[in-house]
Regions:
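Glycoside hydrolase catalytic-domain context in secreted enzymes
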Residues: 19-236
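Bacterial Sec-dependent N-terminal signal peptides
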Residues: 1-22
């Protein structure tokens, strides 16, 4: 009798395991509904620049695509894979050298954001970032952490080279073309840095005091244009 109960419990457990929905492009709502609260929180946390100890999420990203910035956790029971995020914005940034591998993994150094905006040619920008997105795809990353689209407000900002211009309209239009090119490859972007992160103190500090009018007319306008015209996968 005990053996019968044990076999019955095993069969019920197997049925429950196989009854879990597996992620496809058509059943996202069903999979989200099946996630536990802990799984949802874990998925949102992602990895950072913390320890590289075995089992850490950053170590996991390094194992998937060496040199990638980070990854989300996979949820195997629902078929949710890790999402690999890699830095831009002037092309994919990964490690060219890998352990026990004689090959060198080169990425193209594309023009920085200020140069792209200086062309005043959104078609050319999209053509260029289509090639950039192809490298993201071929090297196994899922999301490029780009474009940077804060405004040029202070010449001492150390990240001005990443950003397009001092004008929100030019910034938004250039960003939209940039995004469309990258995402035409089936990989995503993360537009950054939302919002008003236009200059920093010693890289790690920021104190932005902005009026409502300036925020809407200047610092948010480029993001608005990019989101409406290009539908980026993520926002940083």
């Amino acid at each position: 009798m005990k053996r019968i109960f044990a076999i019955g419990a095993l069969l019920l457990g197997s049925v429950a395991m196989f009854a879990q929905p597996q992620l496809t492009k058509d059943n996202i709502d069903e999979v989200v509904a099946a996630m536990t609260l802990e799984e949802k929180a874990t998925l949102l946390v992602g990895s950072g620049w913390g320890s590289m100890t075995a089992g850490s999420m950053t170590a996991s990203a390094t194992a998937l695509v060496p040199g990638a910035a980070g990854t989300t956790r996979s949820i195997e029971r629902l078929g949710i894979p890790s999402t690999v995020l890699a830095d831009g914005p002037a092309g994919l940034r990964i490690s060219p050298i890998r352990d026990n591998d004689p090959n060198t993994y080169f990425c193209t150094g594309f023009p920085v954001g200020t140069v792209l905006a200086s062309m005043w040619d959104t078609e050319r920008v999209e053509e260029l970032t289509t090639a950039m997105g192809n490298e993201v795809l071929e090297y196994g990353a899922d999301v490029l952490l780009a474009p940077g689209m804060n405004l040029h407000r202070n010449p001492l900002c150390g990240r001005n080279f990443e950003y397009f211009s001092e004008d929100p309209f030019l910034t938004g239009k250039t960003a939209a073309a940039y995004i469309n090119g990258i995402q035409s490859n089936g990989v995503g972007v993360s537009v950054k840095h939302f919002a008003a992160n236009n200059q920093e103190v010693n890289r790690m500090e920021n104190d932005s005091r902005v009026s409502q009018r300036a925020l809407r007319e200047l610092y948010l306008k480029g993001f608005e244009i990019a989101v409406k015209e290009a539908d980026p996968w993520t926002v940083m």
